[in-house]
Amino acid sequence: MMKHVIILVILLVISFQAY
């Protein structure tokens, strides 16, 4: 489950940086 959470966090960070 940890890996899934990390992936979600990374995606959110990338989205914020791109935005």
Curated annotation (Swiss-Prot):
Belongs to the Ibs toxic protein family. InterPro entries: Toxin_Ibs. The gene is ibsA. Part of the SIBa repeat region (formerly known as QUAD1a), encoded on the opposite strand from the sibA (formerly known as ryeC) RNA. Disruption phenotype: None seen. Induction: The sibA sRNA probably represses expression of ibsA mRNA, either by destabilizing the transcript and/or preventing its translation. Expression of the proteinaceous toxin is controlled by antisense sRNA SibA. Keywords: Toxin-antitoxin system. It comes from Escherichia coli (strain K12). Toxic component of a type I toxin-antitoxin (TA) system. Overexpression causes cessation of growth. GO terms for biological process: programmed cell death. Disulfide bonds: none annotated. The keyword DNA damage does not apply. It holds the Pfam family Ibs_toxin. This is Small toxic protein IbsA.
